[in-house]
Amino acid sequence: MENNKKKLILLDLDNTLICAEDLDTVKDKKRLSQAQKQFRTVRMEDYYDIFERPHLQEFLDYLFKNFKVGVWTASSKDYAIFVIKNFITAPQNKVKPDRKIEIFLCSHHCNVSKKYFKGISKDLKLVTDQWKIIDLSQVKLVDDLEKLANHQPENVIHVKPFFYDEPNSKNDTELLKVQKTLETFK
């Protein structure tokens, strides 16, 4: 499939692809230590431990093969770049796979969206109507915020939020479900 004909998938980061634990507020250090053994974890300086959602790399391989991929997160720019570099474009310090982020939107862009679109932090009309980057029928947002899915039901794929410390989180298959859903969008 030619890259210029591929549709666009925008990915949220926190609780969609990864889960971050603020190291200053950890209450159960034993549980954190156990989770570090169960999940691929990357420490961002002494601020956060960031946990990879199960099946993330398989999911990303599928996305980059079949779609243009972008990120739209409510997180700060620096934090988002750290997550992208460590989990999306160069995972596990391996040779960088052929993964290029087509569009990168962060907290600033969420604020712009709220300004233009009645308080909705990730209204896709910002990229389709306001900036005219892509047609609305050619884009999907994968996000854990149900509010976004309710606002844009045709364009948002809602995922169950990922928390590393929830029971059975190691067996999470949410990204595989999204992959199956996207088969009909290609």
Curated annotation (Swiss-Prot):
Q: Which residues form the FCP1 homology domain?
A: 2-182
UniProt cross-references to InterPro entries, sorted A to Z: FCP1_dom (IPR004274), HAD-like_sf (IPR036412), HAD_sf (IPR023214), TIM50 (IPR050365)
**Gene3D superfamilies (alphabetical):** HAD superfamily/HAD-like (3.40.50.1000)
Q: Does the keyword Hydrolase apply?
A: yes
The alphabetized UniProt keywords are: Hydrolase, Protein phosphatase
Q: What class of enzyme is it?
A: hydrolase
EC annotation from Swiss-Prot or TrEMBL: 3.1.3.-
What one GO molecular function would you report for this record?
Answer: phosphoprotein phosphatase activity
Q: Which residues form a coiled coil?
A: none
Q: Show the SMART domains listed in the entry.
A: CPDc
Q: Does the keyword Hydrolase apply?
A: yes
Biological role stated in the UniProt entry: May function as a phosphatase.
Record family assignment: Belongs to the IIV-6 355R family.
According to UniProt, the name of this protein is Putative CTD phosphatase-like protein 355R
